[in-house]
Amino acid sequence: MGAGFAPAKSDQTCDRLQKEMKRPLYLLLTLCALTLRAGETARTTNMSSTNRTELATLGGGCFWCVEAVYERLPGVKAVTSGYAGGHTPNPTYQEVCTGDTGHAEVTQIEFDPTQISYEQLLAVFWEAHDPTTLNRQGGDTGTQYRSVIFYGNDAQKAAAEKSKQAAAKKFPKPIVTEIVPLTKFYKAEGYHQGYYRNNQNAPYCRAVIRPKLEKLDKATKH
C-alpha cells in the first residue's frame, strides 16, 4: 500500500512498509453484500466466543492492517491481533519480530455465521493482501508476515482449501498461503489492539492502512 517507504511504526522494533497492490479487485458482489448489511462500526477486542459465534484466524502481513479490515465488516463481533503457528510460548512482539519464534502475526475474528459466513471472511482475506508473495507483504519481510489460514476444524479446512483454489484463478502468480491447524493463539500486547481505530492519524495508519481501506471501499461502490 502506498509507494516507497512507509513511516516508522512509532518507537517499536519493526518498521512497516507496504506497496499498493496493482491488480484488479474481484469478488465485488461479496464485498458489496457485506457493506449493505447493518452492523456495528466499532468492535471490542473481547475474544470470548459464544454458542452463536465462531472464530477465524488469519495472517496476511501486518496484523494492524488485517485487524482494521475485519473490524469494519457487519457480522464481525470482535477482532484481536496476536501470534500463532510458532514454537515459542507466550511470545512478545519483539521476539516475534526476530523471526526466530516461528509465529506469524495473525488476526483472530469472532463472527456471527448468521450474518457473515466463514467463506465471506475468506473472500475478503484474498482481497486484503497479496497471497502470492512468500514471507512478505510489501516491505514487511520475514516469516512472521507470511500468508496463512489457521483452521479450527475440518469444515474450516475444507472451506479454506476450496476458497484458495478459487482465488488461484484470479492471480497471475501461484498463491503461497499456508492452510494449517490452529494449535494455540497468543493475544498480542495491548497497544496492538484496535491500533488503527485508536491511532488513525499515526504516520503508518495514514500511509499504509488508510489507503488499503479506501481501496476496499472503492471496490464495493462499483
Task: Give, region by region, the residue ranges found by the protein language model.
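Hydrophobic alpha-helical segments of integral membrane proteins
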Residues: L28, L34-R37
